[in-house]
Structures are given as C-alpha cells and as structure tokens.
Amino acid sequence: MGRDTLADIITSIRNADMDRKGTVRIPSTNITENIIKILLREGFIENVRKHQEGNFFFFALTLRHRRNRKGPCRTSLNLKRISRPGLRIYSNYQQIPRILGGMGIVILSTSRGIMTDREARLERIGGEILCYIW
C-alpha cells in the first residue's frame, strides 16, 4: 500500500499551525516542491529552506501566524485534501470551485504542471483538484 505524500504534507502543516509551531519539516519531492512554491507565492508561508541529512532531503517551512489568535483550535491556515488515491476528482476550467468567493485557492494538477485555480482559469485548462487552501 502506497503513501499519500500530499495528505502527509497537508496534515503536518495543519497540525503545526494548530499547535502554533514556527517551523515544519517536510520530505522533499517534486510535488511538494511545486506546492510549497505556490504556498510561498500566495503568502500562506513566510520562508522555505532546503536541508540535507545524509541522503535525505527535506524542506523547513516557516509558517505565517496571526498575532491575535484566541483559543487552541483557531487556525489561520486551513487545508483540505480533495482528490485522493481512492477517489480522483477532475474539473474543467469552467467548473473549478471558488473558495470563499476567491479568498482561498484551489491547487490543481494540470497537463502544464501544478498551479492555482486563477492560473488555470487564465490558461483555460482543467485538471485534478488536489486541495483547497483558505
């Protein structure tokens, strides 16, 4: 049985944000690198560093936190996995959902690489809906 690396990434970022950790270590793969670039460009994370321990490469993400959060479960970063190995979800560019009226983003895997919903609409291409971030 294989591992769902995208679900592992989403879970580790969500858990670190809920626990108010400053940094998260994520294994380095091509898909994680593309998703981290999107998160950095959209402003959901502050900084990314690539480290190596032996033959193992990983990313160290610095999370962006709100200063005035109250309560243990109030998170500023919500991530939800949509398409999973057991049930793939595809969409054309016209039916890509808008998250919070455009405040959040949808990450898609298209024939031209991994991109956000705005980029996919501009290029008029659809693909597999990987996750929602708001």
Swiss-Prot record:
One of its GO terms (molecular function) is structural constituent of ribosome. GO terms for cellular component: chloroplast; ribonucleoprotein complex; ribosome. Keywords: Chloroplast, Plastid, Ribonucleoprotein, Ribosomal protein, RNA-binding, rRNA-binding. It is found in: Plastid, Chloroplast. The keyword RNA-binding applies. SUPFAM superfamilies: Ribosomal protein S8. GO terms for biological process: translation. It comes from the Eukaryota. Its main location: plastid. Pfam families: Ribosomal_S8. InterPro entries: Ribosomal_uS8, Ribosomal_uS8_CS, Ribosomal_uS8_sf. Part of the 30S ribosomal subunit. One of the primary rRNA binding proteins, it binds directly to 16S rRNA central domain where it helps coordinate assembly of the platform of the 30S subunit. Belongs to the universal ribosomal protein uS8 family. HAMAP family: Ribosomal_uS8_B. This is Small ribosomal subunit protein uS8c. It comes from Populus trichocarpa. The lineage of its organism: Eukaryota, Viridiplantae, Streptophyta, Embryophyta, Tracheophyta. The gene is rps8.
